[in-house]
């Protein structure tokens, strides 16, 4: 199958123009407000921007993880398993989109990403 280029009509994934950090269950801008261009090796063009995280951003993420660990640890194993299985189901439902995004990011042929990297 032939896939449309990032940003083109018919592309399996519509990339946002900018991605923030995901900390404490929400997307947050980097504290310094800086982003970097993400270039696809397929065309050499910028297809999105990503947060340029600093030590301060990492510390926020670590603080959020430490704050969440006690509640997660107190959750019954069966409930934790259910959450993880739901995540696995969502991944399986979106394998082609994930493979496309990975191919755009690393430049590998889509068949390799679909058959080796993502499953």
Predicted regions and their residues:
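Glycine-rich loop-to-alpha-helix module at the N-terminal edge of alpha/beta enzyme cores
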Residues: 45-119
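Terminal low-complexity tails and localization/encapsulation signals of metabolic enzymes
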Residues: 1-49, 82, 86
